[in-house]
């Protein structure tokens, strides 16, 4: 079978460069396009060189329609507005769209859902094996404990991250809510400040820390009377997300249109 032809969106970004490196070291995939923002000073530069590799001849472009003509998939770790624009093109082309972008609003998520009758989308706030296993464990623990155990999700990321809570924190919150059979939107406590009043029983709390170069730390704390259970994951290198995204693209290649998650890719949906 021929190699899966992939476009990296946000090729000049932190994840974009990691994805270019991951593609170069993975069998069965090849980089055929590199997308950057219109007006970016990186347009025209070589994606390999930007990723710290030898030149690979793939120049950064802002024209996804042209790039996608000969592609099988797009790996998209950009910003919500770009991802929403890319969704329409990927759907029209019928190519796999792996979405790692976080900070998507509920209306962004509705747009993504609306194209999945013709698009093959794998979307997750975190593409690593470890975090998806953590999510499965969180769901199981939340199912076993009653609301006498307060659930708090704490995350820390590098100083350049622009959204909070992280996509991973929200994914873990969804897992905890699923374990408790409640809707996260009705039970989340975000951004406490000032005289907040006592904690509401059943809330799932979120706290975000930013600083330095932290790749991504997440903890789920189950705080009960006189005891606490803590589940945690610490990402040490962005390559775990990049390799996860490639696994997702290869898994989705040839699948029916639909909206899939990393739990589907990793076989953890029924864990
Ligand atoms: N799901 C997961 O496993 C992971 C998700 N992420 C998420 O991925 C996203 C990117 O993270 P990161 O790489 O650190 O961020 P960066 O800011 O380093 O990279 C984003 C890149 O996207 C580019 N971009 C902006 N607009 C467009 C556009 N219209 N078309 C193409 N490219 C565009 C930016 O260009 P410019 O700088 O010129 O604006 C930038 O190069 C974030 O939402 C982050 O939370 C990150 C790691 C793992
Ligand atoms: O912006 C990042 O860096 C990361 N973003 C994702 C998130 O929002 O959870 C995944 C990872 O934690 C790194």
UniProtKB/Swiss-Prot annotation:
Record keywords, A-Z: Amino-acid biosynthesis, Cytoplasm, Diaminopimelate biosynthesis, Lysine biosynthesis, NAD, NADP, Oxidoreductase
Uppermost EC category: oxidoreductase
CDD domains: DHDPR_N
InterPro entries assigned: DapB_C (IPR022663), DapB_N (IPR000846), DapB_N_CS (IPR022664), DHDPR_bac (IPR023940), NAD(P)-bd_dom_sf (IPR036291)
MF (Gene Ontology): 4-hydroxy-tetrahydrodipicolinate reductase; NAD binding; NADP binding; oxidoreductase activity, acting on CH or CH2 groups, NAD or NADP as acceptor
Binding-site residues, NAD(+): 10-15, 36, 100-102, 124-127
Main location: cytoplasm
Function: Catalyzes the conversion of 4-hydroxy-tetrahydrodipicolinate (HTPA) to tetrahydrodipicolinate.
Protein name, entry field: 4-hydroxy-tetrahydrodipicolinate reductase
Species, as recorded: Rhodopseudomonas palustris (strain BisB5)
Lineage per the UniProt record: Bacteria, Pseudomonadati, Pseudomonadota, Alphaproteobacteria, Hyphomicrobiales
